[in-house]
């Protein structure tokens, strides 16, 4: 009888411990989600200095993840990643010398920049307009790719990376969020500007790749510091 009672007590204890652990894990997960938010925005990059002399404006999208260290959302950890295209060229040509002009393809060359940073953010989390400032460190990459695609269906037949490079970067910036619905503060309009100070990197600009006779190409890379201003307009959503 004592053995049976002991087993029952042990089983009950195991159930209580398991339930308590599950509740603790669920509570921690809910708290993590409650303190998390993401922002998706359309982005414009405005190169400055030597970079601005070599390339033009870029357009793309950016994503931001925020984790609030305190319960009010005053101090947060922020991670940003963006991708913008700052140049595009295309030309039509014969698929091959054997086929001739009966089958044509389009060669498209695109230039991209990818800033990635992480750091702290300070915000005023209440009111109709909520300002914030942020800083961070990271890197930004420059990539130029060429695709061969069908003229009509845009099906990519082949792809090649002409040049890729990256440099250390640091960022400072600020912006505002505005609740879109007065009582639904988990969805907010997000507008910001960031200054990104990038180190020296190699990159290509429109016109850097020249086709030569005999199927050869000449690639002239550029190199400079990579400073730019990034403007963002999007929406922030809390969980």
Predicted regions and their residues:
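Bacterial N-terminal signal peptides that target proteins for export
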Residues: 1-10
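Hydrophobic h-region of N-terminal signal peptides that target proteins for export
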Residues: 13-21
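Short glycine/proline- and aromatic-enriched beta-strand/turn motifs that initiate or cap beta-hairpins
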Residues: 22-73, 223, 230-239
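Short loop/turn motifs that connect adjacent beta-strands in outer-membrane beta-barrel proteins
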Residues: 24-35, 69-76, 125-130, 180-189
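Extracellular/periplasm-exposed beta-strand and loop segments of Gram-negative cell-envelope proteins
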Residues: 29, 47-55, 82-113, 140-168, ...
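Hydrophobic core residues within well-ordered beta-strands of beta-rich domains
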Residues: 36, 59, 75, 114-116, ...
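Residues on the lipid-exposed face of transmembrane beta-strands in outer-membrane beta-barrel proteins
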Residues: 40-44, 61-67, 83, 116-124, ...
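Helix-adjacent hinge/juxtasegments
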Residues: 104-111, 120-128
């Amino acid at each position: 009888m004592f053995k049976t009672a002991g087993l029952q007590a042990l089983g009950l204890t195991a159930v209580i411990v398991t339930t308590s652990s599950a509740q603790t894990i669920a509570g921690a997960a809910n708290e993590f989600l409650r303190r998390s938010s993401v922002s998706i925005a359309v982005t414009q990059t405005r190169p400055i200095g030597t970079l601005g002399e070599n390339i033009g404006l870029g357009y793309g999208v950016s994503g931001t993840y925020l984790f609030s260290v305190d319960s009010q959302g005053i101090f947060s950890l922020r991670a940003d990643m963006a991708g913008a295209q700052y140049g595009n060229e295309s030309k039509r040509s014969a698929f091959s010398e054997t086929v001739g002009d009966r089958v044509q393809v389009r060669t498209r060359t695109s230039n991209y920049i990818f800033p990635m940073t992480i750091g702290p953010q300070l915000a005023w989390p209440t009111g109709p307009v909520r300002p914030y400032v942020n800083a961070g460190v990271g890197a930004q990459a420059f990539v130029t790719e060429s695709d061969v695609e069908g003229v009509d269906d845009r099906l990519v037949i082949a792809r090649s990376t002409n040049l890729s490079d990256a440099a250390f970067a640091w960022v400072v910036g600020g912006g505002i969020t505005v609740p879109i619905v007065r009582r639904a503060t988990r969805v907010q309009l997000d507008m910001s500007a960031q200054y990104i100070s990038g180190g020296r990197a190699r990159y290509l600009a429109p016109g850097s790749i020249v086709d030569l006779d005999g199927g050869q190409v000449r690639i002239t890379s550029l190199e400079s510091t990579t400073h730019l201003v990034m403007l963002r307009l999007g929406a922030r959503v809390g969980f």
